[in-house]
Amino acid sequence: HSVERHFEGDVRLLVKRFFDTTMKMIEAGGIDIVGHMDKIYMNGQKYDIFNFEEDWYRKPFEACLDLVQEKGLMVEVNTKNWTKKKELYPRVEYLSRMREMNIPVMVNSDCHYPDLVNDGRKEAFKLLKQAGFKSTRELVKGKWQDIAL
């Protein structure tokens, strides 16, 4: 595994570097959307030590959200794994927090096959409504607009 090869088997170090790199990307600017905010958990959860509730995971993720809010960016809600595992990125548990922080979101499937482009889309909209979102962002005629859910 690459965790063993590149991070000496230390999942916590991998998580730290992932979020450090995400923060650097946000700071560098030139973007509207932060995607794959916590997609690291897709593979990270294969390790027994991996725990979303632990400070070593939660705090750097929340620091990224703080920076997203500060910079006025939006977060991608990625539905790629909804059909297989009923998972979104960021995790469903974080949607309410993003709503509380008034961080706008856009829904994307990140699919590589045209017939899967809408997989999980309706479910993501439903979960966003449950989390208190009233709209998502969509690119309309070259401009980001809030579209009611």
Over which residues does each language-model region extend?
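Extended substrate/RNA-proximal surfaces in nucleic-acid metabolism proteins
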Residues: 1-71
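Charged catalytic cores and adjacent phosphate/nucleic-acid-binding surfaces used
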Residues: 47-149
